[in-house]
Amino acid sequence: DVNEETFIILYDNWAKDKKHVWYQDKIIETADAVSFSVDKSGLPKDKDHVFVYDVDMSSFRPSYCNIDVASAEHFVYKGDGQDWTWIRDKDFVYHDETKLDVDRNTFAPLGETHWWTDKDCIYMDSWNSSLNKWEVIKVDSLQSPIDTLNAGSHYLRNGRNIIYLANVIVKDIEVYRFEEVGLSKCIVNDMLFNNGNRILKDSLNVSEAKFYFYGHIATDKNHVFYSRKQLNDIDAASFHQIDDEIFEDKYYIYTHYCPVKVDK
């Protein structure tokens, strides 16, 4: 039953009257209607509780964490909008209702990348399947310069270190080349990495290598590789691309990425 005289719209999908609070068409039974509000950050709260979305309930409930209600706020906004899983109060940052050991005042997403930083460290949020929850992992101490190849890249330069997702894969080197060459493929100086693992260490001359077909094909003047496999029947010196997925050497045309020989 709605009391029409006191019914008001609070925020997107939120409303209340003098006795009840609604999220969409569901009454939030645990909410104190008199004190309930949605603050300017979009965080629902009453005098005693912050309310968080529960996937299993498909609705909101009071948070289990001991968060300071008065100062609590959402603070993470990415390309697809507000992220409800991140909350901070005057002292701490919380992710999925877990208090984090980070610096509250400087903790923030690193642009649209996979990482987060505060004044001291780099972090990444990762799904822990055994606990069935997200965790925030400390990856490395924060260095300078910090550089991503692009917003979706899995690689991050952190000063003299190179990070792949939540792992430091190269430590304490002078970085003079940092370049993405394919899907999860990256060159660091004269080293080639795929999914964070160094590949073709003693096979490919990375400094002169060319990459084709989203990085699946790599060549130098003596070798042609598809992924990690050397293709010995291709003439590397004359091998080149002639269309999006078509290549040739002095003997054959190779179609798609298999490659399949087609006589000239």
Over which residues does each language-model region extend?
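Non-catalytic tandem-repeat scaffold regions and their flanking low-complexity/translocation tails
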Residues: 1-264
